[in-house]
Structures are given as structure tokens and as C-alpha cells.
Amino acid sequence: MKIFKVLLITLMLLANTAFAAEFSAQVKTSEGIVQGVYDEKYNVVKWFGIPYAQQANREKRWALPQKAEKYTGVKDCSQYAPANLQFNGKNVIGQEGVLTLDVYRPDTGENNLPVLVFIHGGNNQTSNSRLWMGEKFAKEANAVYVSVQYRLGLLGFNNLPALANSNALNDSGNYGLIDQAYALEWIKKNIDKFGGDANNITVSGFSAGGRDVMAMLISPLFKDKFDKAISFSGGLTVADFAESQKIIAGKLAPLVVADGICADEKDAAEWLMQGSEEVRSYLMKLPGERLAPVMAGALIRMKSFPHLYGDGKVLPKEGFAAEKFNSVPLLMLASSDEFTSFLARDPYFKNRMDKVLKDKLITEEFVFANKYGSKFYGFFNGQESAEDIYAKYKAPIYVCMFDFGHDPAVVGETYAVKTGATHGIFLPFLTDQSYPYTVGTDVFAKSGPQELSDIFIASLAAFIRTGDPNNALLPEKWEAWTPQNRAETVFDADGKQAKVYQRSNDTSYDGILEELEADNSLNADSKNYIIKNILNGRWFSGELDTKYHNEN
């Protein structure tokens, strides 16, 4: 049986090399030889599921990543690795502690290509390295693209006292972020074998991954691990260390009660706050399938799932008020309808989405909630982040706004209202898929979106090469952000052509709050409910919650 499996793998690998190739799909890494696959459609080579560290399960749970084991022979990297353990809203899927990465590169003889590393989103609770499939980008940007998997949810972020072991890195509880640092070390050591330039690495991330990237800018752990940074819809978030411990203990308390250790949740939470071996043993023995659903569905609320702890070692206790930054050229992207995807999953709208555009009041409520939620969230992901770090940041900052998705003539009325320029709208412009959007690939195949895709990829390609996104396809210069110009480049398109232009964005929290206060387009009860129950407690809601005395 073993001989048959070896023969089968050998035949499969030979089948993938049956046509002329310029770059070998067999690459010798620090752990051994990995065998990738050729993609004739895109003319790229790709490797899936390369371990950058040992699987962090069993006794390695809530421990620092450990050096990947060496392997003999040829490791088949033609199939995706499992996702990390997570709750997808219905079921627990994946495996615990999958620390792997995927690599894509053009099938050419070129070396010293720029490297783009991607940290996937999903609130640091869900998703996997396939969120952004890299074939199109690797080919058109002529770059090496790497997508990283890291520990998620409470398996990736947990700072309860019982898990401390007197190692400051481990005691931070930021295991998922430390995984990313370890992945960047592996990439720096090995990427030249894939034709990448180890001295030209850009780290990027979307949503939670974007917030992770922004956190890297203040983390001593990430010093000299990358040369440029891109944050796609990721603002500035750091959780208070002590408060996070209390929240996590409270969320795990029902499991302790269910297991008969404590009589009620109050006692259970107090027990979990002990730094005892008894608590540690209990946590280590908990099945991952029971841990994954805890705190699920946080939907950009830090108190629903605290992570990125300001521990004083991995992340400064003072967060982004820190004096020192890992200052590298930085590009930040926001979208003009960031909030629609979160509204669609909010308990209030989740079962009412089919009535949007059919029921007058529900439509008005949705439009109102999206208008202000997206104004706040878009500002948080771009302009506000630039404002907050500019004085201490010693490298250029570029800001852009994706505005595609509003024109019913291009995307249809339903998509224009319910989705618009939603959180992650940039992704279909980097792939040939509409995923994760249901509008369909025919929309993105129109000449306008295709031209926009060309310009966007060219801008990212220029940035990862030089630290400056300007290129021949841009119709006007993309200015670096300053407090004086507040410059951002807008990316949009109609059905026939791209619409890319520079503008000054003078949005402010005070301005949005004043507009919201004066807006009487919605009845008072609905307006009050949305402010106090839908817009509250989000990454961007601090000033809103203070003004309206919201619970968060």
C-alpha cells in the first residue's frame, strides 16, 4: 500500500511537469524539498501548505511556534492545508494549530522578485490562506505572493494567567500574531529559493489581517522583518491586557459550569482567573471543538473577542501612542461601504435582508445604518489611522478609497444598495473571482472594472517594488498623505472605464457625528435603536458611544 501511494504521488507530480516550465516546481527549503504545481492558465507555479512551524496542537497549544520538522524525500505541496480550527456560523471546521503558508510565483526564469505576504482577515477568528488566491496577482504584478495561516480565536489569542510560563513572549497571549512573526522569519530565510528578494518583503493584510499589520508597526517583535506594509481595511486596535483576561474568563465560564467544576458562572470566572496548574490543565484538555465557538460572531467588537493585547512585550501597553514605530512605506485602503457586510450579519438585519428594497422602513433603517457605520468605519481604516501615527511615523503614508459598487447600471440595484463598495471589495480586482461577493464574475468582466483591476494591480506592483504606488497607468499622481493635503486616491469604475482620481478628504469624527445628529431621514425610535444597538461598541464607535452613553 505504501509503495502504491509513493507511485501515485510520483505520477501526479510528473503529470504537473509534462509541459515546458521555466521555474522548477521542486524547491529546497530549510526543512527539505517541496513539490508545487504548475498552473497553465496563469503561467504560474504554486505551492500549498508549506509548514513554517510545527503544528501547534496538543501539548503545543498556547505555546510559542516551534521550528518546522525536517522531511526526507519530496514533500507534496500540491493540495491546500486544512484551515485552522474555527466556527463558521454553523459548524466547527478545520484543524488545530495549522501553521502553513502558500507561495505563488510566475513561471519565468526571473529571480529577486518583490515579495508580497498576505495575512487573511476574519476577525482573527475565521478564514484561511485561500481568502486571496494569488495566481492573477503573481502573474500580473510579476511578484512572489505568499499567504499565511495562523492560529485563530481563543487558540490564537488567550492571555489567561494560567497559561503564563515566565516567558514574556508566551505570556503575552498573542499567539496568532507571534505565528505571523515566525512566518515572516521563515519567509526571509527561504523566499530566495522561490525567486523572491528577501530584502524586498511587503507585509499586507485584510480586515483583521490589516489590523495585525498595523500592530506590527508598533511591535518590537517585527523589527526588520519586512520592508513595506499594506493594510486593506485594517485600523488601529490594541486590547487592554487586564480587561481582556476578565472578558475571556467570563466567556469561558459556562464551559466550567457545564463540566461541574463550579456551581455558577461568577465562581467559574473567578476560578479561571487563577494562575493555577489546575486551571491550566483544564484549559489544555478542553477539546478545540468546544473552544472554537466561544466568542464567535464578534463582528468588529473588541469586547466580544479581545485580541492584540497590549502586554508590554509583543505590543506596547500604550498601543499606538507608542514612541517607536517600525517605519516603512505604508499604504492603507478603505472602502466607502465598509459596514454593509456587518449589517447583513447583525442580529437585527440578519433575518430582514430579504425585505431591504421591499419594506420601506427596513430599507430606510438599513440605508441609515450603512451610511453612518460606513462613514465611521471607512474613516477609521484610512484617514484616522494616518492622522494618529503621522507625527511619529518616519516613512511615506499613502491612502486610498475603493468606491466601486454604487452604480445600479453596473452592479444592479440590489447589489448597489445591499452591498455597494463593501468591506473587501478590492479582492475581486486582484483575482478572476467575485468571491466573496455574489454579484457574479460578469460584473467584474466588464471593460470598466477590468481597467480598474489593471490600474490597481499596477499600483500595488509599483508599491511593493519601490515603496511608491505611482505608475504609468495612474491618470494623476498619487500623493503621499500629510495633515495638510489629507490626500487619498479613489478607485472606481463604470461599465466602460475606470475612474481613478486624487482628492482631499476632510472627514472627521466630529463632522460625522454632527451629520448623524442632524439627520431626520429616519423616525426617532429607529434612529435611536440603530445608534445604541447596531453602531455601538465597534472598533470605530468610541466617540459615538461616549456621546450617546451607549453600552459597548
What are the residue ranges of the model-derived segments?
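Catalytic-loop region of hydrolases
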Residues: 21-110, 283, 474, 514-518, ...
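Hydrophobic h-region of N-terminal signal peptides that target proteins for export
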Residues: 11-18
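Serine-hydrolase-like catalytic core of hydrolytic proteins
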Residues: 82-273, 315-344, 395, 453, ...
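Sec-dependent signal peptide recognition
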Residues: 2-9
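A structural signal for well-ordered alpha-helical segments within the folded catalytic domains
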Residues: 45, 95-99, 178-185, 211, ...
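Substrate-gating cap/lid region and adjacent catalytic-acid/histidine neighborhood
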Residues: 278-450, 459, 466, 541, ...
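Short, solvent-exposed turn/loop segments enriched in Gly/Ser/Thr/Pro and often Arg
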Residues: 151-153, 204-208, 401-408, 475-482
